[in-house]
Amino acid sequence: MIITIEEEVYNNLKKRAEKEEISIPAIVRKFIVSYFNLEDSTKDYKRKEPGESVIIVNGKKYFRINCKMERQNELYIKSELKKKGISVNKLLKELIIVTV
């Protein structure tokens, strides 16, 4: 699942990833899977250099991340987010604020 997140959210996720010594997509997967109470057997890997692309829109940076997870979970998450009318970025922002 390819997600786009704001720079502020990305930096917070990056700090958490360094602390737990796993990749940023693994941290994103952890947050999303735990939020929806799902089980995902995708392995977590440590990455030294990010493979994300940066997009700049009106002077604001966004990062595009490829977050791998089981296909059935990906479809379920997309449909639930669509029902709620929120994006992954907004969900992660709320989860990060709650856990800080």
From Swiss-Prot:
One Gene Ontology BP term is: regulation of DNA-templated transcription
Q: Which InterPro entries match?
A: Arc_rbn_hlx_hlx (IPR013321)
Q: Which domain of life is it from?
A: Viruses
Protein name (Swiss-Prot/TrEMBL): Uncharacterized protein ORF100b
Annotated organism of origin: Acidianus filamentous virus 2 (isolate Italy/Pozzuoli) (AFV-2)
